[in-house]
Amino acid sequence: MALQVELIPTGEIIRVVHPHRPCKLALGSDGVRVTMESALTARDRVGVQDFVLLENFTSEAAFIENLRRRFRENLIYTYIGPVLVSVNPYRDLQIYSRQHMERYRGVSFYEVPPHLFAVADTVYRALRTERRDQAVMISGESGAGKTEATKRLLQFYAETCPAPERGGAVRDRLLQSNPVLEAFGNAKTLRNDNSSRFGKYMDVQFDFKGAPVGGHILSYLLEKSRVVHQNHGERNFHIFYQLLEGGEEETLRRLGLERNPQSYLYLVKGQCAKVSSINDKSDWKVVRKALTVIDFTEDEVEDLLSIVASVLHLGNTHFAADEESNAQVTTENQLKYLTRLLGVEGSTLREALTHRKIIAKGEELLSPLNLEQAAYARDALAKAVYSRTFTWLVAKINRSLASKDAESPSWRSTTVLGLLDIYGFEVFQHNSFEQFCINYCNEKLQQLFIELTLKSEQEEYEAEGIAWEPVQYFNNKIICDLVEEKFKGIISILDEECLRPGEATDLTFLEKLEDTIKQHPHFLTHKLADQRTRKSLDRGEFRLLHYAGEVTYNVTGFLDKNNDLLFRNLKETMCSSENPILGQCFDRSELSDKKRPETVATQFKMSLLELVEILKSKEPAYVRCIKPNDSKQPGRFDEVLIRHQVKYLGLMENLRVRRAGFAYRRKYEAFLQRYKSLCPETWPTWTGRPQDGVTVLVRHLGYKPEEYKMGRTKIFIRFPKTLFATEDALEIRRQSLATKIQATWRGFHCRQKFLRVKRSAICIQSWWRGTLGRRKAAKRKWAAQTIRRLIQGFILRHAPRCPENAFFVDHVRTSFLLNLRRQLPRNILDTSWPTPPPALREASELLRELCRKNMVWKYCRSISPEWKQQLQQKAVASEIFKGKKDNYPQSVPRLFISTRLGADEINPRVLQALGSEPIQYAVPVVKYDRKGYKPRSRQLLLTPNAVVIVEDAKVKQRIEYTNLTGISVSSLSDSLFVLHVQREDNKQKGDVVLQSDHVIETLTKTALSADRVNNININQGSITFAGGPGRDGIIDFTPGSELLITKAKNGHLAVVAPRLNSR
């Protein structure tokens, strides 16, 4: 049988049991899984599963080509050592099912193809076995699949981890926190329909049994400017559209909202309210359910939605200038809704939106705002309300996720697994303050990534006793220092500009940068650039040379966004809010605190430093996400875009670090188990230490000293070509081993089959001979007994039934009945019947009569009503004429028909004269006069009540059946007959003499219609009839050679008729 294999999206090579059936088996040493090395034979088609095995590992083109090959085969995961590289397929590959989770659960990292679940399981097992906190760092560009990867990790832990003792409440809250955070923190951008507009770090706490018992979420730098402004083709945060699309009518009415997003200023700027890939209505149902799961009360949900609605109403609040150019609120309806939703006084809110409170020398002064300032204050309030509500929402979720057993002694044994879903490096056509912060974050994480990767490599080498070799790589510390260094860094200069008195602007900030860090090799402005570079730099821009490439930032809005200014009277108004959530978001302590709050950049820098410390305290795992194209199309591989991401993710740096020492490393046990067949000394079993076996094996394979090193528990192979050569040799060895195994197996199988057949044949032959002997003896015994009984019965066959003749009598009876069954009569006319034995004569007669009745019954059931009527008439004709009328035998084979005249042959006047009386039978006849016997053509009609004689269109005579006394006919073959009527009937002139060509049929139907079957007289010689009052007529019948009807000299009607049948 030919071996058929197939590559599936997980990267596994599976054996197809039958090409036309869906049953498949994975190949591997354990019969279930394949190892990474098993896929090396297919490397020319699908690439290598670990970039470390690339021969030309320094070539970016080779790196991207390997990515392309795997992407083309729907293999979206590839390793760089322990780092997982994921390419977004933009479609569902069906590789995240429960079955896939079980495949990767509890399996060594390299025993299965690359997958997110392999990373998840490795991290989880390290968390449990080493009792050390872990962290999974997920990074990549917007739209690369970071949020989806985070959700898949949480799904894996929710499905595979043991349930806590108190049920799955924590597990459900961890999963349901995602839809809520996505609704309030994600939005549609040009690059991603579900882009996270904030950074997220989630800690999941596990007890000593490995069950999730709690969690905590940290959020970073929400893009709150999106609340008031979106670029073309982008949307605001999802929650606004979900509320409008999915909210109940009563809810929207209470919030003063309508369903059309085009009605709200904050939702129309991107001109992209509807997105085909987003179902806001169904997402709203998911969010509402999730809020319940994470312990939101109905009052809290109502307060939260009031805040969301208030942001929309703020966007629709408009101003107009009065005579002094001061702003005045013109949308009173919006103000009314805002007053109710925010829980503040209307007059206070109106004043706060149109005035600014200034404290000078201990005195409070109100300064009116112009239109531009009022719009700024309104937008600042909207951003502050939304961003602080988001912060409160994260804190609320954290309270829901907090473990309820934090005070118990077992709490000390908990471990933490961190999930970092942070925004990727961003380079847009116009880059502002948000991109500066995001890219600074990526610089810090890249610095941490290189440090931790080098550290883990060095620790492994030291643990294995391998000499550490220094690695050349780009250290981006110089860029991090450029941004964050005290006094000289960009953030310090930005803060200084924000805090200094006087007219500080974005351009003065840029000038300060040029004066302070103009000599830095990674910093450039229009003023500092050469003549050629100035063409690509405006005067209000500066350029940073990041590790991922150059990014040009526009300083417009830097100071404003860094200050994040909210006027004091707006804070005071919000602090007085009766909305419980806003009451927690705007604390009155802010009003009494005279200290200027930290700037946004400083807050972000401090939180980022804290995050770095958190990640350093944990054992890291990395998932690097790549977006294959900007159009979000499955199957499209944009090489330019991917090369850019490979660069800014530092994947080539990571690969160089990993390959600086050795490309491949494996435990001695695993290496020996896989390749032991290549050496006669280690095949088929090695009984010594695995390390000694590997030493013998590599010596036999001819490894050069510079190609490998032997550690304490692992073998290290420096070059991929060495591993490829070993793998190719293994493939050849497997072919020869397979041939040998097949030959041995075939011989063994055939011999075993022969021995089984031989044993079976002997057993069957022995059993069958015994069976035949027993059957033959039993048959002889039975035959002798039967013959003896038959002879005894034959001798006593005439005696009464007794035990001696009972068998013979029963046999005779049975034989007769069986023979009778084969010789039963086929029809009622068949009178044959087998001769019965004396003992069955009476039973035979009963059966014969029963059989005849049964045939008659079957025949009667089979005839139609018309045929039944025909037979009945024939039976009446037979009863009347059989043996009495000479021409009767000739009428027997002729069928009686219902009428001899069609409807068109009877004059309509006759039909009119009869009225509703139906005609049962009609026949043409010849009527003979009573005196001269002149023949006249007439029609005889039978109705239910009378015989009617018709001449053309006139009814000549009507004889009621009650007046019909009889019918006379001769015994010869003539066709004359006489209808006798009562002599007392004055309406009748006498009897009627008629001739019909169908005399038997006519007389039978007349007799049946008139009920005169017994009144038909068949006469010989002559018939006397009443010719009129007091006068009789005579018809004389004589046999002759031919039919002749004449008037005789004696005044009689003479009829000569031939004889048709001898009597």
UniProtKB/Swiss-Prot annotation:
Region feature Actin-binding, mapped onto this chain: 608-630
Listed GO MF terms: actin filament binding; ATP binding; calmodulin binding; microfilament motor activity
Binding-site list for ATP: 88, 96, 139-148, 192-196
Keyword Lipoprotein part of the UniProt annotation: no
UniProt domain Myosin motor: residue ranges: 47-731
Expressed in which tissues: Widely expressed.
Modified residues (N6-methyllysine): 383
Subcellular location: Cytoplasm; Nucleus; Cytoplasm, Cell cortex; Cell projection, Ruffle membrane
Modification type N6-acetyllysine: residues: 486
The protein's role, per its UniProt record: Myosins are actin-based motor molecules with ATPase activity. Unconventional myosins serve in intracellular movements. Their highly divergent tails are presumed to bind to membranous compartments, which would be moved relative to actin filaments. Involved in glucose transporter recycling in response to insulin by regulating movement of intracellular GLUT4-containing vesicles to the plasma membrane. Component of the hair cell's (the sensory cells of the inner ear) adaptation-motor complex.
The protein's name in its UniProt record: Unconventional myosin-Ic
